[in-house]
Amino acid sequence: MRKLLYILIFTLAASSAAAQQMPERRLVRKGNRQFRKENFDRSVDLYMRALGADSTSFEAGYNLGNALFRSERYDTAEQTMMRAAADSTRSDTERAEAFYNLGNTQFMQKKLEQALESYRNSLRLNP
């Protein structure tokens, strides 16, 4: 009986520790739910908190850029998408999507030459 109690305590402690190591993932999922509901300001907040938990999270940064774009905060969305597009650890497809969205933010700001170059970069990575 005592052995079973120790196993139970160990299992609970291990699962609790694992859950605490992934707060960024949980925040990104919550942000995604808010984004789907078109609560863009709330999703921006959640993605920013996720980046606070893990500043290297590509998904949090990329999704933050999309939420900022949908909130019509194009200048901040542009900066965020630039970071996502520059992340050389990601696949060409992911970076191509980031460059495409970067082009969209630049287009909305009437930065047409920069937008064109971002679209070209997207096509170079994923023709």
Task: Give the residues covered by each predicted segment.
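Hydrophobic/aromatic packing residues within the alpha-helices of TPR/SEL1-like helical repeat arrays
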Residues: 40, 47, 81-82, 119
